[in-house]
């Protein structure tokens, strides 16, 4: 009886080992199939018939061979000239106000008066006639506008007289200032002497009051 039980145990253990071995094989084959299914296989051959054909490359010098050589515009010159003339007419003249106006200087003629001359009894000479020809002295009036400048005769005596008059006026003013300064100094000296006299008088009065007391 014990021998039969031992044999049954051996058979069961052998079956268990076989089943476990088969189970391991089945698991390994399933895992290998999953890994092989995840991988993507790429084709190793290339079909050149599917590649589009490229056009032949042309040289850049042959690009303008078919282009027109000349372009003719009819009526363009006249329109451009008319448009330019209209633009010139519409453009304002910015320098119109800057052009100077030239005016001639006015001349004032002063007649020289002649002294009265008494004639001799024979009547050869008499009073000077007002209608007689006199020597005219031109006087030029300087205009503020731009104009022609005539020659002007300079009178040296007149300049000297004006300088003498100006020097005399300056001398008179200087003398007057000196006189005013001396007058103020004398007035200050007089006031100072009056104050000194009043002070001495008060001092004497105070002394006399002390003696009487």
Curated annotation (Swiss-Prot):
The chain crosses the membrane at residues 7-27. Keywords: Apoptosis, Coiled coil, Golgi apparatus, Membrane, Phosphoprotein, Signal-anchor, Transmembrane, Transmembrane helix. GO terms for cellular component: Golgi apparatus; Golgi membrane; secretory granule. It is found in: Golgi apparatus membrane. Residues 179-206 have a biased composition (Basic and acidic residues). The keyword Transmembrane helix applies. The modification Phosphothreonine is found at residue 41. The keyword Transmembrane applies. InterPro entries: Cancer-assoc_antigen_RCAS1 (IPR017025). Residues 179-213 are annotated as: Disordered. It is a single-pass type III membrane protein. The modification Phosphotyrosine is found at residue 94. The coiled coil domain is necessary for the homodimerization. This is Receptor-binding cancer antigen expressed on SiSo cells. It comes from Rattus norvegicus (Rat).
């Amino acid at each position: 009886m014990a021998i039969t039980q031992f044999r049954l145990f051996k058979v069961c253990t052998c079956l268990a080992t076989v089943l476990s071995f088969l189970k391991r094989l089945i698991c390994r084959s399933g895992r290998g199939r999953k890994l092989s299914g995840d991988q993507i296989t790429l084709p190793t051959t290339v079909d050149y018939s599917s590649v589009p054909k490229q056009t032949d490359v042309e040289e850049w010098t042959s690009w303008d061979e078919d282009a027109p050589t000349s372009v003719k515009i009819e009526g363009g010159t006249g329109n451009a000239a008319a448009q330019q003339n209209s633009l010139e007419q519409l453009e304002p003249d910015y320098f119109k106000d800057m052009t100077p106006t030239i005016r001639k200087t006015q001349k004032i003629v002063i007649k020289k008066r002649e002294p009265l001359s008494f004639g001799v009894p024979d009547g050869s000479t008499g009073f000077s006639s007002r209608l007689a020809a006199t020597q005219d002295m031109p006087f030029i009036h300087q205009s503020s506008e731009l104009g022609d400048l005539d020659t002007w005769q300079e009178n040296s005596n007149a300049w000297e007289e004006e300088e003498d008059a100006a020097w005399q006026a300056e001398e008179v003013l200087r003398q007057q200032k000196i006189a005013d300064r001396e007058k103020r100094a004398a007035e200050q000296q007089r006031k100072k002497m009056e104050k000194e006299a009043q002070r001495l008088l008060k001092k004497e009065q105070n002394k006399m009051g002390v003696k009487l007391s």
